[in-house]
Curated annotation (Swiss-Prot):
<feature type="binding site">
    <location>
        <begin position="155"/>
        <end position="158"/>
    </location>
    <ligand>
        <name>substrate</name>
    </ligand>
</feature>
<keyword id="KW-0546">Nucleotide metabolism</keyword>
<dbReference type="Pfam" id="PF01725">
    <property type="entry name" value="Ham1p_like"/>
</dbReference>
<feature type="binding site">
    <location>
        <begin position="182"/>
        <end position="183"/>
    </location>
    <ligand>
        <name>substrate</name>
    </ligand>
</feature>
<feature type="binding site">
    <location>
        <position position="177"/>
    </location>
    <ligand>
        <name>substrate</name>
    </ligand>
</feature>
<dbReference type="GO" id="GO:0017111">
    <property type="term" value="F:ribonucleoside triphosphate phosphatase activity"/>
</dbReference>
<dbReference type="GO" id="GO:0000166">
    <property type="term" value="F:nucleotide binding"/>
</dbReference>
<feature type="active site" description="Proton acceptor">
    <location>
        <position position="68"/>
    </location>
</feature>
<dbReference type="InterPro" id="IPR002637">
    <property type="entry name" value="RdgB/HAM1"/>
</dbReference>
<keyword id="KW-0547">Nucleotide-binding</keyword>
<keyword id="KW-0479">Metal-binding</keyword>
<dbReference type="GO" id="GO:0036220">
    <property type="term" value="F:ITP diphosphatase activity"/>
</dbReference>
<feature type="binding site">
    <location>
        <position position="68"/>
    </location>
    <ligand>
        <name>Mg(2+)</name>
    </ligand>
</feature>
<keyword id="KW-0460">Magnesium</keyword>
<dbReference type="GO" id="GO:0036222">
    <property type="term" value="F:XTP diphosphatase activity"/>
</dbReference>
<protein>
    <recommendedName>
        <fullName>dITP/XTP pyrophosphatase</fullName>
        <ecNumber>3.6.1.66</ecNumber>
    </recommendedName>
</protein>
<dbReference type="GO" id="GO:0005829">
    <property type="term" value="C:cytosol"/>
</dbReference>
Length: 199
């Protein structure tokens, strides 16, 4: 059994990732109270930052992986981007709940004709010997004109993101979402990479 340590404390990410990386002989462990300041300028930099921090915490002896992801909107100069999780504080200097954050995006997009947006995910994996591999995934879509208040699934910006078949991410169950999402695509690449080293 190979144990991988996932550098996150986000329960939503943990649930999505555990479903995708459901591989026999691989166990995913979550560190307790893991919280690293994301000071990178790109998704890749932030992902590496988290992976390297956890690798160091585990005395450079355990395989670790991390991911950084976010929403990039063309009409907003690719914001929220790396600030997706804390866009409220970046833009307004105060903390908002998920619905309020989605309202902020809808308001900023009110006069915009170009509603093209992308969800981007970068995974960084550090093996026991210190070798680093990165995996990327992207989902293209558009920003909706309003919020799905009846969301049954998803989290974050899912209620305002329309996929190319005009469905909100919040309308999809976890299995459906993982088949098309940025995170699903990136972790599928990571999964294929890991499978090479299993008996």
């Amino acid at each position: 059994m190979k144990t991988l340590f996932f550098a996150t404390s986000n329960i939503n990410k943990i649930n999505e990732v555990k479903q995708i990386l459901d591989i026999p002989k691989i166990k995913i462990e979550i560190p307790q109270n893991f919280d690293i300041k994301e000071t990178g300028k790109t998704f890749k930099e932030n992902s590496l930052l988290k992976a390297k921090a956890l690798f160091k915490i585990l005395n450079n002896k355990q395989p670790v992986f991390s991911e950084d992801s976010g929403l990039c909107i063309e009409a907003l100069n690719m914001e929220p981007g790396i600030y997706s999780k804390r866009y409220d504080q970046y833009k307004l200097g105060k903390k908002l709940d998920n619905n309020e954050k989605n309202h902020l995006i809808i308001d900023l997009m009110r006069e915009k004709n170009n509603r093209t947006a992308y969800f981007i995910c970068v995974i960084s994996y550090i093996d026991v010997d210190g070798t680093i591999n990165n995996f990327e995934g992207m989902l293209k879509g558009t920003i909706a004109l309003n919020i799905d208040y009846y969301q049954k699934n998803g989290f974050g910006y899912d209620p305002i993101f329309l996929t190319t078949n005009n469905k909100r991410l919040s309308e999809l169950n976890l299995e459906e979402k993982n088949k098309i999402s940025h995170r699903g695509i990136a972790f599928d690449k990571f999964k294929k990479f890991l499978m090479q080293f299993l008996d």
